[in-house]
């Protein structure tokens, strides 16, 4: 594959923007495709007006793509994640049909696997340092099928967490709740974190039509953070206060995670989320992961292919690591302003944090010749963080 081809595949596959269809034989006869059957519930009389739906905050494919990239990295040996296969199993494609899930299931190119390793390495270090400083609560925004809770609680010495809350759309929390309830390897960790033995029976309750799962330690919360058009007086901060705050203790040090979420929100909405956490918790930390520098050819490819699917990234105006860090210390946050902030690209994390032994280990897993190409890709993704409170002040990468 050419360098340009590698770059395009990484830009679209790794971030979850769109999948590239498999190559076809130009000399092959065109396959017969039956006429598509109408979807149930979508046949409407011509005179009826179609109800307008709000676009999703992030691409619908970002959930399976994000998890399959992680599964690919774990399969090759970059990561250890025994829970990914329990939380997501892509459906089998129909014979002769192109399905994005089938592409997502395949092993990813080395560029993507290395990027997934560095992303996980950096965020894991920040989360661990938060917990080592007495952090007690974690809120994962747009969690999808993230496995971090289980990776933390399955450690030989699990952290002393008080609450772990995952938030996403109901159509995404529903299958996750079903899989948690189905697998004892998942629900055995839902009890109090101080207990080494799994609690008897099922330590959780399922509600809201199967979209919410709650336990003394863990909550999977179905929630759309966007204000409803039917309630113009509502705001993101009001939604967070009404639905999320009852799950937490504002007196405890709290971390919020937003991985590939804010680009699909307006800068005003993401600022309101950061401000709410800074105002609500006197000791707080935020970690954001997203892309930067999208004004070059790499970013233009991503934006063009998102536009094909009628998706945009209005929150991608923070084009440098410095501007990403500045989101936490902006005067516009007023009382929600964080005390300190920082940011690093994945390339900086590779150069400064991963370490020679780990780099040597992963270099033996796959052949990766184009280091300059890798650098170009990794410099377009950044991990930014902000801290507030005395015990959180020195946390950084």
From Swiss-Prot:
Protein name per the record: Leucine carboxyl methyltransferase 1
GO molecular function, one term: protein C-terminal leucine carboxyl O-methyltransferase activity
Organism of provenance: Cryptococcus neoformans var. neoformans serotype D (strain B-3501A) (Filobasidiella neoformans)
Keyword field contains Transferase: yes
Source organism, top-level taxon: Eukaryota
Annotated Pfam families: LCM
GO BP annotations listed: methylation
Family: Belongs to the methyltransferase superfamily. LCMT family.
Biased composition (Basic residues): 44-55
GN (gene name): PPM1
Keywords from the named record: Methyltransferase, S-adenosyl-L-methionine, Transferase
E.C. number(s) listed in UniProt: 2.1.1.233
Binding site for S-adenosyl-L-methionine: 119, 142, 168, 224-225, 259
InterPro entries: LCMT1, Ppm1/Ppm2/Tcmp, SAM-dependent_MTases_sf
Enzyme type, top EC level: transferase
